[in-house]
Amino acid sequence: GLSNPTTSGFGRKTDFNTDTPSPTDNINYMNFVGDNMSFGKKVTSDNVRRLVRKISWSRGTKYEMYRHDYNLNNTSPITGSARLYDANYYVMNSDFKVYVCIDNGSSGINTTGNASLDEPTFTDLEPSKAGTSGDGYQWKYLFTVSPSDIIKFDSTDFISVSNNWSTSTDSQVVAVRDNGNSDVNNNQIKKVYIENQGVGYSNGTGQEVNILGDGTGGKVVVNV
């Protein structure tokens, strides 16, 4: 259970007047609330979940690409968000599977990307396109909301997230967690964004470009 038990109170024995008082953070007000509520219910850890904003996948909608560098001077191109957490960079599909958008077909000449046409449904752990429309999207599967959490916590506004992600023995959670933590996948580059495509390059495939970062020897292959 919770180390600091929480109780949720309901109701009031008498009506509030039209000028509802503002809550006050002191012992006297806590006693007032306790004296006036109809009943209370202890909230256990089984009845608590972390929540994230619900963004449901919908055909024809543009979703933002995951980027680590959104800020006041580089806002997300669709929602104008100054930080990643306010951008629409992930979705939940109709089967309660959650995905992060790795690529939305955007570039320096198409800054807002394309409309998403294929609903992601796969559970493979490698980022993949969702269908054959050619919409330019690449999705990374994150997790599936469990049936019990759907019943208890599903709402129009929020997605529930497992409380024990780091210790869960659920096979689906373990597979995603271990894949993300593996030496193979840690610090991989899954997407290269071209801000300026330049001019005058010869057509061809397999041209190598150095990656500048905190490692050594990294290269990407560019097809012109």
Listing of model-derived features with the role each one plays in the protein:
Residues 134-224:
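Conserved, function-critical positions that sit in or immediately flank catalytic
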Residues 1-96, 102-108, 114-161:
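Extended assembly-interface regions of large multimeric machines
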Residues 96-97, 187:
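Beta-strand-connecting loop/turn residues
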